[in-house]
C-alpha cells in the first residue's frame, strides 16, 4: 500500500472551485470518484489525518497512488460529472446500488388504433400512458391478469395481432374472455377504446363509480334470473377488489412522490423507497450498500438521487416530490439536477407531520428491518471469504491471499464447437463484467484447448505491459510524479485503462491465481503455456471433479483440503461458475450451428438479402455453383459481398472463419 503523503498534491495547486476528483491505484484504475463544493477543502480532508479516517475511506486512501481532479463552474455541473464518471469507471470504493435496471411500468399505447396494455421499462415515449412504477414486473402482470377479466383489452404484440387478423382466429386470451379480440372484428375500434379508457380510469384511482356499476348490473342480472351473467359479474367485482387491495390509497390529494428512508451502521446502510403515484403506493424497492466514508442522512440522500435517478432511464421515474429524512447540503443543486432529468420541477422536503410523516416513519421501519435481516444473513460473510482466501494461499504456498482469481474451463462434444470460458472472482466474489468467452478453432481436445486459451489470455496481458514498458508500471506510484492539474492526461500505465472509457482494457489485469477445471494433465498443459510466455508470477492449480483434489504443477500427488474447508468451497464455486459459463456458450453455438445456413455467417448479409438470393437461385447448391458476376445480378449484392458468399459456401463448417 502507498503512503498517502507520497502522492498528496500541494495545497496551493488545488483550486477552491466546485469539481470532481478521482483517486487511482498503481495501474491507473479509478477506484473512487467524488464531488466537492470546494476541491481544496475536500481533498485536504483526506490527507490531514488519514489514520483516523472512516475504515473504508482509510483503505481507499492507502490503496490509491495518485489523485487528480477537474474543476467546473457550478455544483450542478459537478453533480452531473460525478454521476457520469461513476457510471463510466465503476469505482470499487464508491457506494453501489447494484440493482441498475430501470423501473417497470404498466403502459397503455393510447396512440394506436387498438391500444395495447403491456409492461415497459426505460425512457417514456410519446403517445403512451404510464402507470407505476412497480417494484417487480410480476406484480404488474398479476394486477393486469386480474383486470383483464373486467377490461378485456389487447395485450399482444403487433405481429401477433396482425397474424390473428390474417387467419381470422384470435389467440387463447380471446377464447377465454380475457381479450375482446379486436383483431378478428369481435369489437370495433371505438368499443375497444372504451374498454381501454375504463381500464385507465380504474388505474388512475377512479374506482368507486365502476364498483357501483358492477354491483348494480349484478343485482339486475340476478333479478332477471340471469344467474350465469350475475356469477360472471360477481367474479369481475371480486377481481376488481383484489386489484384495489394491491393499491392502497395513502394520500387523498393524488400525491406523486417517492418516500425514501435509511437505516445505517458505521459500515453499511439500508435504503428503502416507497413509490406513491396518484396517492397510491405502487411499489417498493430496497438496497443495502457499503459506506465508504462517514455519511450523514443528507449525504445518503445525495448518493441515492444521483445513482438511482440519473442515467439513461432516469427521466422515466423521477417523481414530482421526494420525501426524505434529511435534506443534503447541496439540496438546491440536487433539485435543479433532478428537475433537468424529469423535465419539470422536482422538490425535496422533510415531512414534519400528518400522513406523509407517518408514511416516512413506516418506510424507516422497513429500512431498519432490512438492515437487521441483512446483517444477520451476512454476519460471517466477510470473515468467511477472508478465511477461504487465506486457506487457499496456505495450501498453494502463496505469500498473500489471491484477491483476483481466474478460472478456465473447456466445453465441447467430440471436438466440435470447442469453446472456453474465463470467470473472475475478486475478493472472493464474482466479477461478472470481467468474464470472457473464447472460440477455440485450432484444438480438438481439452489439453490443447486449455493451452490455447491461456496463451491467448496472457499474450493479451503481456502485450498491454509491453506497450508501456516495465518502467511505467514500476513508477506508477512515484512520489515525485506531478499530481493534480500538472499530472499527465493519462497514467503512464494508460494501456491498462482505456482512455476513452476509463475502464480496464480486456485482460489488462493479471490474476494472483489461475484455476483450471481438471487434474494433473490440465494443470501440466496450463503450466507449459504460462512457461512458454514467461509468466512466472501467477500461481496455478487445478480442481479435479469427483474427489475434489487440488493439483499443483510438478507435484506427483494432489493437495487434499478438508471437505468442510472454506477454501475448498470457494474453489468449487469458482470452478462450477466457469463450467456453467462455458457450457452455456457451447450450447448457444451448437444450437446456432444446427439451425443456421452458411449464409448466416456472411458479415453484413441480412435476412432480406438472404431471402432474395434464395428466391433468385432456388437453393444453396445453385448459389454455390454461381459465379461472382451472376450473384451480383441480385439487387443489393455487390462484388465484395458476392465473394464473401462464395467463400462461406465453400467452407460450410465455418472453421476457417477469422478469429474475433
Swiss-Prot record:
It comes from the Bacteria. It is found in: Cytoplasm. Residues 469-501 are annotated as: Disordered. SMART domains: GIYc, HhH1. Gene3D superfamilies: 5' to 3' exonuclease, C-terminal subdomain, GIY-YIG endonuclease, UVR domain, UvrC, RNAse H endonuclease domain. Residues 16-95 form the GIY-YIG domain. GO terms for molecular function: DNA binding; excinuclease ABC activity. One of its GO terms (biological process) is nucleotide-excision repair. Pfam families: GIY-YIG (PF01541), HHH_5 (PF14520), UVR (PF02151), UvrC_RNaseH (PF22920), UvrC_RNaseH_dom (PF08459). One of its GO terms (cellular component) is cytoplasm. Residues 208-243 form the UVR domain. Residues 476-486 have a biased composition (Low complexity). Keywords: Cytoplasm, DNA damage, DNA excision, DNA repair, Excision nuclease, SOS response. The keyword Transmembrane helix does not apply. Disulfide bonds: none annotated. The keyword tRNA processing does not apply. CDD domains: GIY-YIG_UvrC_Cho. The UvrABC repair system catalyzes the recognition and processing of DNA lesions. UvrC both incises the 5' and 3' sides of the lesion. The N-terminal half is responsible for the 3' incision and the C-terminal half is responsible for the 5' incision. HAMAP family: UvrC (MF_00203). Interacts with UvrB in an incision complex. Belongs to the UvrC family. This is UvrABC system protein C. The gene is uvrC.
Amino acid at each position: 500500500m502507498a503512503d498517502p503523503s507520497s502522492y498528496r498534491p500541494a495545497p496551493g495547486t488545488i483550486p477552491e472551485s466546485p469539481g470532481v476528483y478521482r483517486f487511482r491505484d498503481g495501474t491507473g484504475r479509478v477506484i473512487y470518484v467524488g464531488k466537492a463544493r470546494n476541491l481544496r477543502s475536500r481533498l485536504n480532508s483526506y490527507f490531514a489525518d488519514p489514520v483516523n479516517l472512516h475504515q473504508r475511506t482509510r483503505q481507499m486512501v492507502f490503496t490509491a497512488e495518485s489523485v487528480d481532479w477537474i474543476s467546473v463552474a457550478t455544483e450542478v455541473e459537478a453533480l452531473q460529472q460525478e454521476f457520469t464518471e461513476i457510471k463510466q469507471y465503476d469505482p470499487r470504493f464508491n457506494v453501489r446500488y447494484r440493482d441498475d435496471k430501470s423501473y417497470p411500468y404498466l403502459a397503455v399505447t393510447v396512440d394506436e388504433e387498438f391500444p395495447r396494455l403491456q409492461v415497459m421499462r426505460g425512457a417514456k415515449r410519446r403517445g403512451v400512458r404510464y402507470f407505476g412504477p412497480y417494484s417487480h414486473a410480476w406484480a404488474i402482470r398479476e394486477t393486469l391478469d386480474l383486470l383483464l377479466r373486467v377490461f378485456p383489452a389487447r395485450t399482444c404484440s403487433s405481429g401477433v395481432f396482425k397474424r390473428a387478423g390474417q387467419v381470422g382466429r384470435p389467440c387463447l386470451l380471446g377464447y377465454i374472455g380475457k381479450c375482446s379480440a379486436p383483431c378478428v372484428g369481435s369489437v370495433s375500434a371505438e368499443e375497444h377504446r372504451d374498454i381501454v379508457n375504463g381500464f385507465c380510469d380504474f388505474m388512475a384511482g377512479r374506482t368507486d363509480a365502476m364498483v357501483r356499476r358492477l354491483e348494480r348490473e349484478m343485482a339486475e342480472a340476478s333479478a332477471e334470473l340471469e344467474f350465469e351473467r350475475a356469477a360472471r359479474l360477481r367474479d369481475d367485482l371480486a377481481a376488481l377488489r383484489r386489484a384495489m387491495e394491491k393499491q392502497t390509497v395513502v394520500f387523498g390529494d393524488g400525491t406523486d412522490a417517492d418516500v425514501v428512508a435509511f437505516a445505517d451502521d458505521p459500515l453499511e446502510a439500508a435504503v428503502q423507497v416507497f413509490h406513491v403515484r396518484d396517492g397510491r403506493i405502487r411499489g417498493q424497492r430496497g438496497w443495502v450498500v457499503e459506506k465508504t466514508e462517514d455519511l450523514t442522512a443528507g449525504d445518503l440522500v445525495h448518493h441515492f438521487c444521483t445513482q438511482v435517478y440519473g442515467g439513461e432511464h432516469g427521466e422515466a421515474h423521477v417523481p414530482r416530490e421526494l420525501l426524505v429524512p434529511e435534506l443534503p447540503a447541496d439540496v438546491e443543486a440536487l433539485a435543479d439536477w433532478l428537475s433537468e432529468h424529469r423535465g419539470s420541477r422536482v422538490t425535496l422536503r422533510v415531512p414534519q407531520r400528518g400522513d406523509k410523516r407517518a408514511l416516512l416513519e413506516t418506510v424507516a421501519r422497513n429500512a431498519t428491518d432490512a438492515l437487521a435481516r441483512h446483517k444477520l444473513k451476512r454476519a460471517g460473510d466477510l470473515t468467511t471469504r477472508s478465511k477461504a482466501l487465506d486457506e487457499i494461499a496456505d495450501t498453494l504456498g502463496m505469500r498473500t491471499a489471491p484477491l483476483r482469481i481466474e478460472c478456465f474451463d473447456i466445453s465441447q462434444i467430440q471436438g466440435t464447437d470447442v469453446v472456453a470460458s474465463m470467470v473472475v472472482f475478486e475478493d472472493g466474489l464474482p466479477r461478472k463484467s470481467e468474464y470472457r468467452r473464447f472460440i477455440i478453432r485450432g484444438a480438438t481436445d481439452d489439453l490443447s484447448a486449455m493451452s490455447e486459451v491461456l496463451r491467448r489470455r496472457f499474450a493479451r496481458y503481456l502485450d498491454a505491459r509491453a506497450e508501456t514498458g516495465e518502467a511505467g508500471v514500476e513508477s506508477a506510484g512515484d512520489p515525485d510524479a506531478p499530481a493534480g492539474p500538472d499530472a499527465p492526461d493519462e497514467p503512464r500505465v494508460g494501456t491498462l485503462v482505456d482512455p476513452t472509457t476509463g475502464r480496464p482494457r480486456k485482460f489488462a489485469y493479471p490474476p494472483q491465481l489461475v484455476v483450471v477445471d481438471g487434474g494433473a494433465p490440465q494443470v501440466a498443459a496450463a503450466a507449459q503455456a504460462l512457461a512458454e510466455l514467461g509468466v512466472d508470477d501467477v500461481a496455478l492449480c487445478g480442481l479435479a471433479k469427483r474427489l475434489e483434489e487440488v493439483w499443483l504443477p510438478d507435484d506427483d500427488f494432489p493437495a487434499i483440503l478438508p471437505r468442510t474447508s472454506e477454501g475448498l468451497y470457494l474453489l468449487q464455486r469458482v470452478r462450477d461458475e466457469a463450467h456453467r459459463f462455458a457450457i452455456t456458450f457451447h450450447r448457444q453455438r451448437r444450437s446456432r450451428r444446427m439451425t443456421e445456413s452458411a449464409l448466416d455467417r456472411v458479415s453484413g448479409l441480412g435476412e432480406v438479402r438472404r431471402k432474395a438470393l434464395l428466391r433468385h437461385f432456388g437453393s444453396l447448391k445453385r448459389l454455390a455453383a454461381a459465379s461472382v458476376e451472376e450473384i451480383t445480378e441480385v439487387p443489393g449484392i455487390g462484388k465484395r459481398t458476392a465473394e464473401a458468399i462464395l467463400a462461406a459456401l465453400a467452407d460450410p463448417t465455418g472453421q476457417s472463419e477469422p478469429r474475433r
